[in-house]
């Protein structure tokens, strides 16, 4: 919910963003079908990069591609370990898209900076 509004706002604000995804090159077709290819500055697919999240190098490479320091990036992800732990480890601010699931008791070394139920909840954070 709110995804299209968020994407439109990012376009209007000329705020660059990227995608980091674990998986194969099939992910490119998914990104294309969703109409994101022209909106996304950087796309990192783990099969092409050679390492999967939470490997810190893939997060640093995305930051370099965006030409934004890790400390100035808000990383949004739905997997506590692969996304939130990985991004947090390189100094990114994190937002966990929880999709109705509780934070795992097994992950105590890191917590997300923000917890959201939908991408639309990012707008107030980005506007601040």
Where does each model-flagged region fall?
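Asp-based, Mg2+/Mn2+-dependent phosphohydrolase catalytic module
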Residues: 4, 8-11, 15-128
